[in-house]
């Protein structure tokens, strides 16, 4: 599924799908946004932020935010657009993220959610001296996970097909 098809799908749902990118020192920082526009007012319902390195395992997902009262399929559009963008525009074929230890019990929910999306656990990042570099990159401790871009995109495509949206 291509970005252009996802943008058309978003439009059919009354939404706007945008991808912003900037390059700094060989890193491509990106932001995927799903919003709704009414007259001159834009409401951002959700976004994904991250960066890419120029290799197959280079997609790094940093922030996923979806508002609680958002319309249906916001997170699915964000995931699909992020994976489609990476596959179309970068050499990245897998994504990495950290389910950060924020609140008691919330980390387990994040890990469960990311597993449903198609991610698997690489390792627990904690207070071990060997984890210092990863803690600096991700800004904390948590569960480091990886997922394959094609399979995550396919999961979203199957969901859209089941809802007769594509």
Where are the regions that the model predicts?
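Non-catalytic substrate-recognition and accessory regions of acyl/acetyltransferase enzymes
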Residues: 1-73, 80-99, 103, 107-120, ...
């Amino acid at each position: 599924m291509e970005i252009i098809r996802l943008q058309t799908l978003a439009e059919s749902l009354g939404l706007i799908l945008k991808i912003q990118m900037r390059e700094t020192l060989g890193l491509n920082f990106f932001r995927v946004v799903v919003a709704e526009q009414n007259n001159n007012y834009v409401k951002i319902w959700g976004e994904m932020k991250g960066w890419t390195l120029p290799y197959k395992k280079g997609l790094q997902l940093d922030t996923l935010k979806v508002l609680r009262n958002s319309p249906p399929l916001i997170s699915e559009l964000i995931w699909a657009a992020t994976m489609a963008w990476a596959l179309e525009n970068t050499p990245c074929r897998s994504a990495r993220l950290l389910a950060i230890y924020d609140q008691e019990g919330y980390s387990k929910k994040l890990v469960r959610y990311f597993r449903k999306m198609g991610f698997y656990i690489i390792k627990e990042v904690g207070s071990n001296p060997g984890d210092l570099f990863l803690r600096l990159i991700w800004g904390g401790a948590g569960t480091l996970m990886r997922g394959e871009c094609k399979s995550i995109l396919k999961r979203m495509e199957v969901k859209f097909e089941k809802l007769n949206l594509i």
